[in-house]
Structures are given as structure tokens and as C-alpha cells.
Amino acid sequence: MQDRLISGTEKPEDHFDRAIRPTSLADYIGQPVVREQMEIFIGAARGRGEALDHTLIFGPPGLGKTTLANIIAREMGGNLKSTSGPVLERAGDLAAMLTNLEEGDVLFIDEIHRLSPVIEEILYPAMEDYQLDIMIGEGPAARSIKLDLPPFTLVAATTRAGLLTSPLRDRFGIVQRLEFYSVEDLTHIVSRSANLMDVPITVEGAEEVARRSRGTPRIANRLLRRVRDYAQVKGTGEVNHEMAQRALDMLNVDKAGLDTLDRRYLSMLLERFDGGPAGVEALAAAMAEDSGTLEDVIEPYLIQQGYVMRTARGRIATNQSYLQFGMTPPEPKN
């Protein structure tokens, strides 16, 4: 898949965002339902002097799952120990992390849907009973010993909650889904980031960046950096509406936040498959892309914005897709 400026997946350049991430729920912009619930859950756990229930955070990439995990650790007054599903290859890898936890710490596992079954089996007693089962020795002489673990909170993140096994999913007391952000919330995020980056920006400039950011803070901050560069070279350095518009047009990010790959997907669905229904495998083959890329990277935003419907028979283009390409929507079928 081509490198996408508006991809929600983290890139090396996005590591800069860590310096401008909010560090408390009070500074956390957007996701009002999640924020209110976590304020209550964290406040109650702190009041009882207990570890927060294990928490699963899921949603499309770039919406702030890692940021929320960091905030949870800070609000609970514990240390954050981070890892990811693909990194935990051996039982010893997870055992080492668990035995190094202190009371109240938060263990963050990103991409938890990629854990192996062996690692999951170790997690079950650790999550339920704060115990770690370890095998000592090999063969007939092998024996199992139990180690007590301090009360801790497992915070897990995934873009594909449906791939979690039921036994693992059922062990999370708190499950939060992050939704795409509104233009209003993203405008506040862009303004806040610009202020921290010492970039002069108008409300209209911030709103234009927000409108084309696909409801995703990571993309908004990435576009802001590129617009800043454009304004510095082509203007006075201030990001106003005109500067943002010209910069984003140059970057092939249109007013709807769609890029070349989005338009190619919609064009393929409309023209090659007559608007659908089309199976994801057929679409992926026609685009020479992986079906997982379509499902995880391209389709979530297009579906959320009403360009595509996902049905049992396949993907169907909506009237909005036809209008986006200046085409006349088909007459409804009787």
C-alpha cells in the first residue's frame, strides 16, 4: 500500500506528537462519553484505594488509544509499562514484565489481538487473581508454581476487537470504543497543538485542517506540520484559511478528507463494480491491495462518513459517493 499522509497508522514522524499529547482527563479533548465514564471509574478506584479494572480500548488507528492509556496511568498514580502483542513472543517475555510490576502500575499492551494463545493463557490468572503460573523444569520432573502479583491494571488497545477471543475479551471490566472526532473537537486539538508548536494559526485555519483530518487527531497533527511548512515557505508563517486550503490541495487531501487511495477505492466500486454489491476480496484484487488494508485502513472512514455501506452481499456505494464524483445516483430498485 502506498504511504498515506492521511493514514491513521503511526509513522516515525508522529513520535513528535508525544510532546503535545494531553496528560490528564481534564486536558483530553473529545470522546465525551469515554471521558466522563473514565473520570467516574478512575475516581471510584482511587477512592477505594484499588487498582482500576482491566480496560480494553478499541477503535480505528490514530484516535488516541495510547494517549488514553498514558492518562489512565497518570490519573491512577502508577507507572506505565508498554509493550505490544507481536513483541510478546515467548511466555518468558510476558512473565518478565508482570513480575516487574509494582502495585498500581498499568501494563499497556497495544495490538492485543495479535497475542499468541500461549501468552493469553498466562494472562488469564494474572488478570483474574493477580497470579502468575510458572513451569519449573522439563519433562516428568516439571512442576508448576504460583507467584503472587501486585494489584495492577491491564490496559489493552486494538483496532480489531472482533479478533479477540471471548475468554480474553470477557476478562476486561471496562470496554471503551473511541469514535471519530467532530470537526469542532479537532479544531480545538489543532489550535492546542499549534500553540504548543509556536505556530500562529487562525480559527479558520485550524478549522480547515480539522475538516480534512478524517476525524482523527493523529492525522490532524500530521497535516498541521505540513501546512506549517507551506505557510513558512509560501507565506508569512501564519496558518490562515487560505494557507491551509492551498497547502492541503497541494497534498491531494480534498475538502472531504479523501486522498488518492480513497478516491481510487470509490472509483473502482462505482465504475468497475457498478456501485456494488462487491465483495472485499474482489475489491482488494482489483486494487492490488490486501483485503485487511481495505477493512482496517480505507473503509472505516468511508463507511462512517456514509460513502459506502457494508452488507452481507458486499460493499455498496451510496448516493453520496456518486455525488462526490459528479455522477447521477441510480434510481432506487423496486
Swiss-Prot record:
The keyword Transcription regulation does not apply. It catalyses: ATP + H2O = ADP + phosphate + H(+). It is found in: Cytoplasm. SMART domains: AAA (SM00382). Residues 182-252 are annotated as: Small ATPAse domain (RuvB-S). Its main location: cytoplasm. Gene3D superfamilies: 1.10.8.60, P-loop containing nucleotide triphosphate hydrolases, Winged helix-like DNA-binding domain superfamily/Winged helix DNA-binding domain. Its EC number is 3.6.4.-. GO terms for biological process: DNA recombination; DNA repair. SUPFAM superfamilies: P-loop containing nucleoside triphosphate hydrolases, Winged helix' DNA-binding domain. GO terms for cellular component: cytoplasm; Holliday junction resolvase complex. Residues 1-181 are annotated as: Large ATPase domain (RuvB-L). GO terms for molecular function: ATP binding; ATP hydrolysis activity; four-way junction DNA binding; four-way junction helicase activity. Keywords: ATP-binding, Cytoplasm, DNA damage, DNA recombination, DNA repair, DNA-binding, Hydrolase, Nucleotide-binding. ATP binds at I20, R21, G62, K65, T66, T67, E128, D129, Y130, R171, Y181, R218. Belongs to the RuvB family. PANTHER family: HOLLIDAY JUNCTION BRANCH MIGRATION COMPLEX SUBUNIT RUVB (PTHR42848:SF1), PTHR42848. Has 3 domains, the large (RuvB-L) and small ATPase (RuvB-S) domains and the C-terminal head (RuvB-H) domain. The head domain binds DNA, while the ATPase domains jointly bind ATP, ADP or are empty depending on the state of the subunit in the translocation cycle. During a single DNA translocation step the structure of each domain remains the same, but their relative positions change. The RuvA-RuvB-RuvC complex processes Holliday junction (HJ) DNA during genetic recombination and DNA repair, while the RuvA-RuvB complex plays an important role in the rescue of blocked DNA replication forks via replication fork reversal (RFR). RuvA specifically binds to HJ cruciform DNA, conferring on it an open structure. The RuvB hexamer acts as an ATP-dependent pump, pulling dsDNA into and through the RuvAB complex. RuvB forms 2 homohexamers on either side of HJ DNA bound by 1 or 2 RuvA tetramers; 4 subunits per hexamer contact DNA at a time. This is Holliday junction branch migration complex subunit RuvB.
